[in-house]
């Protein structure tokens, strides 16, 4: 028997994010997923060492690797469309749920039982889910920052929206990252490596 789950996951590299906006550099879902997993792990370490928020860094990082897996089936729905109305938000949530179910069906039952909670977020506590959501937003904020730094004003409003959304989350780990890490994303290689 063949199980196409991982081959389908590999197609994340073909899904372009920010599809309704002019980008100086395209970003694939695969790139975003990796960035989000790295950020989620770091936010968990910040929680562990600085804020005391209980979390499992490895579990959150793995869940981050699968957090947008349903988009392989649904595509990347632009945020303004996804959250335009409660009806659209609910319909998209139902579509995501069905996508997770469809993808899990591409695995043997015992593997599906372990991966489904990573794809649908049920593997996470409320605090861990908040950290993953903050990492997802930070990834978007970093993309907007990079685009703006490249002179692309198409992302100005998105940058403002991402900052406001992060602030509204009242996530001390994200606040720590914004203060101590985000400014480095505007530095050049020599400044980053202090050569």
Each language-model region and where it sits:
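Alpha-helical, largely C-terminal catalytic domains
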Residues: 1-195
């Amino acid at each position: 028997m063949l199980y196409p789950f991982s081959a389908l996951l590999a197609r994340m590299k073909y899904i372009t994010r920010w599809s309704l906006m002019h980008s100086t550099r395209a970003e694939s879902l695969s790139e975003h997923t990796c960035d989000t997993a790295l950020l989620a792990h770091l936010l968990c370490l910040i929680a562990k060492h600085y804020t005391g928020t209980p979390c499992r860094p490895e579990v959150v990082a793995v869940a981050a690797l699968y957090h947008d897996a349903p988009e392989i089936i649904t595509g990347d729905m632009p945020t303004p469309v996804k959250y335009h109305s409660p009806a659209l938000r609910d319909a998209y949530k139902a579509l995501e749920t069905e996508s997770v179910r469809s993808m899990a069906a591409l695995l043997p039952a015992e593997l599906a039982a372990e991966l489904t909670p990573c794809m649908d977020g049920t593997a996470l506590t409320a605090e861990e889910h908040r950290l993953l959501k903050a990492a997802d937003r930070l990834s978007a904020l970093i993309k907007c920052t990079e685009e703006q730094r490249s002179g692309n004003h198409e992302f100005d409003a998105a940058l403002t929206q991402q900052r406001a959304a992060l602030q509204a989350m009242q996530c001390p780990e994200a606040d720590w990252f914004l203060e101590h890490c985000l400014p480095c994303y505007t530095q050049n290689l020599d400044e980053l490596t202090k050569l």
